Amino acid sequence: ENFAGGCIPGYMRTADGRCKPTY
């Protein structure tokens, strides 16, 4: 599934619009 923001699986969207790993 694709999330808004287009981060790869295992990553989340941060408040500044970037992607960071959730681990």
Swiss-Prot record:
Q: In which tissues is it expressed?
A: Hemolymph.
On the tree of life, the source organism's domain of life is Eukaryota
InterPro entries per the UniProt record, alphabetical: GBP_PSP
Q: Which GO terms describe its cellular component?
A: extracellular space
User: Which keywords fit this entry according to its UniProt record?
Assistant: Cytokine
Q: Where is the signal peptide?
A: none
List the Pfam families.
GBP_PSP (PF02425)
What are this entry's molecular-function GO terms? cytokine activity
Question: Is Iron-sulfur given among the entry's keywords?
Answer: no
Query: What is this protein's function?
Result: Causes rapid, rigid paralysis when injected into Lepidopteran larvae. The physiological role may be to reduce hemolymph loss following injury and promote wound healing.
Q: What family is reported?
A: Belongs to the GBP/PSP1/paralytic peptide family.
> What is the protein name stated in its UniProt record?
Paralytic peptide 2
Species assigned in the record: Heliothis virescens (Tobacco budworm moth)
